[in-house]
Amino acid sequence: MSGGDFVTGGGWINTPSGARGNFGVAGGIKNGAFWGHLVYIDHGTGLKVKGTGVTMYQVTGPTSRHIEGTAEVNGQPGFTYQVDVADNGEPGRNDTFALGLSNGYKAGGTLQGGNIQLHSPCK
């Protein structure tokens, strides 16, 4: 397990179809356990993702983090997700969000609106 820091974020990216993909994400390690959440909606396809658990939180760079977990897709359980986020400046300047699902769906890029925020460990 990594860190003690945590990440939160929300906003939107352009999806592969050119539509808006809205998301809310958080992840970290608290009291020795992974925690977090994910919600994502692709407004082009109608795809809806709701995270149901976090199985990994990893430091991948000075301002980037990797989160993995389980999810429901369009209300159906049994999927997994991978999220990569980067907090590249304030407020949300050049921040990135990327999502991959076990069903093959992928979307990601620089935020068109919103912010990824990396937080220091709570004391």
How would you describe each model-predicted region?
Residues 101-123:
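Edge beta-strand at a domain terminus
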Residues 21-79:
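Predominantly extracellular/secreted and cell-surface proteins with exposed
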Residues 9-11, 67-71, 99:
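Residue-level detector of buried hydrophobic side-chain packing
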Residues 2-5, 60-65, 90-93:
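Edge/loop elements at the starts and ends of beta-strands within beta-rich repeat scaffolds
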Residues 14, 72-74, 102:
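Solvent-exposed residues in well-ordered beta-strands and their adjoining turns
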Residues 35-40, 92-102:
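Short polybasic amphipathic segments
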Residues 77-97:
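A short, surface-exposed beta-strand/turn
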Residues 1-16:
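Boundary/junction segments of secreted and surface-exposed precursor proteins
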